């Protein structure tokens, strides 16, 4: 609508892996295709959306090159599941994360990596957030985990307008696509802007808060539901929407708001050696005057449990560790 061309590719992106997009409609009698999003305004940019071949390495490499040559376009690659991007790790290491530092070559490529610990097993749960955060330095790219539709929208809109161009890694939702609690009003889209940190949404009284839980992504909604179930009015839950560049001022502002709190928590679904914590332990802890405890799954060689029963037990243990210490 604002004149930015959008090019999107990936495996099953026209429909969406989770049957959530339906960006291209197919006539099964004539084989004609029609995309409603191409007909919103007479002055809109062009939308090109392609179902790509099953080669992450080849496709991300091509889209990276396209984004370099067309930096004014929003060039997006979406994984079916976030961990499928590991097939293109060479491109991510050699080009996406480091080309500006090595050669002064800038890219505006967007990677959408569906992520979420929802009981789907080791190969469909983790986008390997820790790997992207390990590559972050010198303001080389943005890594974000939007937790609401409006946050997702404002993140992409900001990226389209941002100069100089930088890659954007979005740890995108799965379960949240259909979770009623993860919704936004029309006003949330038409007003405001992307917020790197979203403060507590429950209306807790800051002076009465004894525990502040920082979280990023899907786990926020589990924590919110558990807090309501317990009738807890002394815990504030803060959503960190942008992981890099680390929003230091916004995090400190939340800590200052709850100055009476004595229990500061970083909560994550991922094992202790994965997810956001290794990055936060290195970059966040040294700049805050608080002791922060980690609540996570135990360190693991595998990203996630292989059985639904074990997954459920781990999720229950996380809630107890957060609210009972």
What do the PLM-derived regions correspond to, one by one?
Residues 9, 75, 110-112, 144, ...:
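Hydrophobic/aromatic beta-strand patches that form the interior of the parallel beta-sheet core
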Residues 45, 139-140, 233, 290:
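A short helix-to-beta-strand connector/capping loop
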Residues 1-72, 77-100, 186-238:
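Non-catalytic terminal/interface segments that mediate subunit docking, oligomerization
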Residues 20-21, 157, 305-307:
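Short secondary-structure transition/capping segments
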Residues 64, 74, 79-199, 273-283, ...:
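Phosphate/diphosphate-binding loops
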Residues 11-13, 52, 79-80, 113-116, ...:
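Fold-independent oxyanion-binding glycine-rich loops
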Residues 3, 70, 136-139, 163, ...:
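A structural signal for short coil/turn segments at secondary-structure junctions
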Residues 105-106, 116-130, 177-325:
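Thiamine diphosphate
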